Design a protein with these regions (language model features):
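A conserved regulatory-domain signal marking ACT and ACT-like small-molecule sensing domains
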Residues: 1-180
Length: 180
């Protein structure tokens, strides 16, 4: 529905302080015949933190991300688990820069003290490998090819994040060079 779309864009514009010129309803994206993947990037400056057993209710993810943003900590890959049926909680995992580790843990420790049963868990040493290409939206199966290439090297994927022109896999640090 066009009216619903316009309302959503107005709300986004207000939240992110966008001008009318910066907002487009149903933008057209044309195949520019760019390569499916133009480059691969390996980021070794990442860690993974999970906040376990957080309340499964509106605002929980916002509270976690806002708490970290107040400490100038940026998150990249964010994954939320399905609800755990017994206690109505979820787990939220994310990656951030290694040098933000102690600030993030300190900020989150105070926050999760308010949520009974919640705890912080630091994942194993990880790296972020990303395939980037403006041809991805026009090529079917790009993510599958990336996942297959990693599987062929016996590399397990811990987390996945995608955008229109990027597919990112979080993998064990020991496989970073091999994944390239």
């Amino acid at each position: 529905d066009a009216e619903l779309g316009k309302k959503a864009l107005r709300n986004v514009g207000e939240v992110f302080k966008l001008t009318d010129k910066q907002i487009t309803l149903n933008p057209t994206i044309e195949n520019n015949n760019e390569p499916e993947v133009r480059g691969i990037a390996l980021d070794k400056d990442q860690i993974q933190i999970s906040v376990k057993n957080v309340p499964d209710k509106p605002g929980t993810a916002s509270t976690i991300c806002s708490t970290l943003a107040e400490k100038n900590i940026s998150l990249d890959t964010i994954v939320q688990s399905e609800r755990k049926h017994k206690d109505k909680t979820k787990d939220i995992s994310f990656t951030l820069k290694k040098n933000d580790r102690s600030d993030a843990k300190y900020a989150l420790k105070e926050l999760i003290g308010n949520w009974q049963g919640s705890k912080l868990e630091e994942g194993e040493s990880i790296v972020r490998i990303s395939a980037v290409g403006s041809g991805m939206p026009f090529t079917k199966g790009t993510a599958g090819k990336i996942f297959r290439a990693l599987a062929n090297q016996k590399i397990n994927i811990e987390m996945i994040a995608t955008s229109e022109i990027r597919t990112t896999c979080i993998i064990s640090e020991k496989y970073g060079e091999k994944a390239l």
